[in-house]
Amino acid sequence: MLPSIAKHVASHQINPLKKHGQNFIFDSSLCDKIVRASHLAENSRVLEIGPGTGGLTRSILQKNPESLTVIETDERFIPLLNEIKEYYPNLNIIKQDALKINLTDLDYDKVTIISNLPYHIGTELVIRWLKEARLITDMTLMLQKEVVERICAMPSTKAYGRLSVICQLIAKVEKCFDVSPTAFYPPPKVYSAIVKLIPLANPPSIALINRVEKITTFAFAGRRKMIKSSLKNLVPNIHEVLTQLKINDNYRAENLAPQDYLRIAMSLSVNKL
């Protein structure tokens, strides 16, 4: 029988490294709650980034997935994870930097992603995975609360921005619950939250999403400017484009819905961007 998460970590004399922004979760009930929020089906193929202490890893394995692949860059955790594997042979351990791995490298038809993501690379990973959405069943992720609020934000709200637009064009997004800093050791300075993203059946093409990314970069760089002003350096005839699409050119970036940005991207030929 495996020891508790805390005892298991202590037996390996592993301490969180500040330089890596590490904060450990020892509460197995929280890990179970995250997995429940994912509605993980038996016999799923699951991917976890940054398993660390293995708490979330254990909770996932207890749901009997077909396989769980974990990607861990900190070699201190590999022996601990190997001990978990002795009880769960369907656990696959890859020592690698998550930013250096694409989902296509893992030979998945479809994968469910459940992770407590390292906050310094969380947003980058989310965007990268969304561009490989055809390979993903769904994602249940722990991120900084501020990032989750940006992912889920509606137009005309303070949190709404580029991340909101991109995520909502590719996936259905839902905030599940907040996580207090006291759930971690040591406690971080910010709250965390769990978000679930389910890729849409027919998301826009990657080429279109890349175009939307470029448009929103210009639009939200001048967040308080009218859209006709913030986009004029990118699209000289932006007034005509917005008029044709029946989008009010006095709107600011935060007033346009994700679909409005997609319509602008679709109306522009590649050579115009």
UniProtKB/Swiss-Prot annotation:
Keyword terms: Cytoplasm, Methyltransferase, RNA-binding, rRNA processing, S-adenosyl-L-methionine, Transferase
Catalytic reactions on record: adenosine(1518)/adenosine(1519) in 16S rRNA + 4 S-adenosyl-L-methionine = N(6)-dimethyladenosine(1518)/N(6)-dimethyladenosine(1519) in 16S rRNA + 4 S-adenosyl-L-homocysteine + 4 H(+)
Localization: Cytoplasm
Main location: cytoplasm
Annotated residues for binding of S-adenosyl-L-methionine: N23, I25, G50, E72, D97, N116
Record has RNA-binding as a keyword: yes
NCBIfam families: ksgA
Role description: Specifically dimethylates two adjacent adenosines (A1518 and A1519) in the loop of a conserved hairpin near the 3'-end of 16S rRNA in the 30S particle. May play a critical role in biogenesis of 30S subunits.
Record-given protein name: Ribosomal RNA small subunit methyltransferase A
Organism: Rickettsia akari (strain Hartford)
